[in-house]
Amino acid sequence: MIRLICGLQRPTSGSYRLYGSENTDKKILEAQRRIGAVVETPSIYLDMTAEENMKEQYYVLGLPSFEGIPQTLKLVGLEDAGKKKAKDFSLGMRQRLGIAIALAGKPDLLVLDEPTNGLDPQGIVEMRELILKLNRERQITVLISSHILDELSRLATHYGFIDKGTIVKEITAEELENTCRKCVKLQVTDTAVLAHILDKRGLEYEILSDTQANVYGELVVSDVALELAEQNCRM
């Protein structure tokens, strides 16, 4: 999916839309120019410095001036890399250089494929902070492909789930959190009585019908059952 929207691969079937343009429309190329991406491994020249790598990308994009390079390198935390060659960078530094290169064209959308893969704990924290910074300070939308759900939960506002090349579900972070909450479904003879008991205990719940309710959080079922029985309500 990522390779398709970045124009690195053609679809064998199906379609996609970017900024209102179908993939079969000639305007799709204009839409793809609004995207910066780091797909799989960063595309960098190992025998060049961070600044030299950036200049190469500026040449490729036909940008008239190198003025933005120092600012971009500072943004990703590579302003002090100096004359150090990329081959001597840590994995985290290479990832950040890849992002700097992807930012050269001032994209609206940044696509990152497994950006924390292989990084040590400190590198993961730095990558997370950088992604949040790009979103908050430059208003760049970031599309992340990752299997590390715990890390995604610290970043994502929306999730998309893909199965065999098809997006099967899209959901907000809040909706996902609610879906994944611990929940006990209770069936009773009177949910009005159950609601009164749960309110006293300060528990969150959802009444599904006259006889069924979902209860969220830590629940001692035996205690609730005893209290229900005292009020002639069976569970």
What are these language model-derived features?
Residues 106:
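Conserved catalytic motifs of ABC-family nucleotide-binding domains
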Residues 128-214:
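ABC transporter nucleotide-binding domain
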